[in-house]
Amino acid sequence: MTLGGVTTGTDAGTYTATFTPKKKYQWSDGTKTAKQVTWKIDRASVAAPTQSGSLTFNGSPQSPSWSGYDTGKMTLGGTTTGTNAGSYNATFTPGANYKWSDGSTGTKTVVWRIGKAAGSLSLNKTSMKLTAAKKTDTITVTRAGDGVITATSNASGVASVSVSGNTVTVTAKAKGKATITVSVAAGTNYNAPANKTCSVEVTMPTNNLVL
């Protein structure tokens, strides 16, 4: 027999070769005409990419590095750049000659992340003295990001606290000492920093202050 038709291929797909019996031969079904035989090149298998390394919020747009990403084998889409800490969805679609390792050929979504940066917290004062003449004082809080500010007193009968924005107001209640602890919760882009404290001493002519 003689071989003809498409006998060589490069891309994945289906091809058709032909076989024709020579003059003294015929097919087992008694025919002598060329027969078509389909042959196939399967798609090559590739693994879905994953984020390589880690990203941390820095206030600027960032894009991840990818492990297993080959521009000749797949296309990248979806969300490929982000600024805020959080999770983002990129997409990868295999080219015409490739399939995923699970055999599928559709678009895959791959999650990548930007981590929160280390938080920071500072107070404009670490100690204060309150008297009958000066019954209140304030602490100005400086923090990175938008984490909620809270403050507590370990002796609310001596000094109470309230928070408004980034200002902590301390009010004298009675003679004694107290420690004010200021905390900042994790925010959108920053982790919670370590707490800071301010020591308070209340001096009064009597043990109790009438407000």
Q: What is each PLM-predicted segment?
A:
Residues 1-211:
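Solvent-exposed beta-strand/loop surfaces, strongest in extracytoplasmic domains of secreted
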